[in-house]
Curated annotation (Swiss-Prot):
Protein name per UniProt: Large ribosomal subunit protein uL11
Keywords (A to Z) from UniProt: Methylation, Ribonucleoprotein, Ribosomal protein, RNA-binding, rRNA-binding
Mod. after translation: One or more lysine residues are methylated.
Described purpose of this protein according to its UniProt entry: Forms part of the ribosomal stalk which helps the ribosome interact with GTP-bound translation factors.
Entries under HAMAP family matching the protein: Ribosomal_uL11 (MF_00736)
GO biological process assignments: translation
Quaternary state and interactors: Part of the ribosomal stalk of the 50S ribosomal subunit. Interacts with L10 and the large rRNA to form the base of the stalk. L10 forms an elongated spine to which L12 dimers bind in a sequential fashion forming a multimeric L10(L12)X complex.
UniProt source species: Psychrobacter arcticus (strain DSM 17307 / VKM B-2377 / 273-4)
InterPro entries assigned: Ribosomal_uL11 (IPR000911), Ribosomal_uL11_bac-typ (IPR006519), Ribosomal_uL11_C (IPR020783), Ribosomal_uL11_C_sf (IPR036769), Ribosomal_uL11_CS (IPR020785), Ribosomal_uL11_N (IPR020784), Ribosomal_uL11_N_sf (IPR036796)
CC per GO annotation: cytosolic large ribosomal subunit
Recorded family membership: Belongs to the universal ribosomal protein uL11 family.
Pfam families: Ribosomal_L11 (PF00298), Ribosomal_L11_N (PF03946)
């Protein structure tokens, strides 16, 4: 028989840096999950990724206080900021441009996010990421 699901928790956790401090500790503590067990499993699962890379994580908590988690790909905005070499997006994206990315960089981002994108083909996925870049004030070349 399948376990009864008690709830879901969605968090963005830095790769390899999960610890019991906020926001992880309080979120898991409310559901009665063993916080250190999650931190150890998450850090082991993200040990092959760049430390500090924000990983959106969906944790399923069961009624017996056990858990499973699914890791998604890093947010497009983070990957775009990294590719453009900027600290943050523009406050006024239509007038003030803060960085520049080209098609090759967008293709790399699409390959990273491939599993989480719902686009039909590569060009549609690139256009999706390019739209995110434009809304951040990043100039897109070659699209």
């Amino acid at each position: 028989m399948a376990k009864k699901i008690d709830g879901y928790i969605k968090l963005q956790v830095p790769a390899g840096k999960a610890n019991p401090s906020p926001p992880i500790g309080p979120a898991l503590g409310q559901k009665g999950v063993n916080i250190m067990a999650f931190c150890k499993e998450f850090n082991a699962a993200t040990s092959n990724q760049e430390p500090g890379l924000p990983i959106p994580t969906e944790i399923t908590v069961y009624s017996d206080k056990s858990f499973t988690f699914i890791m998604k790909s890093p947010p497009a905005a983070y990957l775009l900021r990294k590719a453009a070499g900027i600290a943050k997006g523009s406050g006024t994206p239509n007038t003030a441009k803060v960085g520049k990315v080209d098609r090759a960089q967008l293709e790399e981002i699409v390959k990273t996010k491939d599993a989480d994108l719902t686009a039909a083909d590569l060009d549609a996925a690139i256009r999706t990421i390019a739209g995110t870049a434009r809304s951040m004030g990043i100039t897109v070349e070659g699209v």
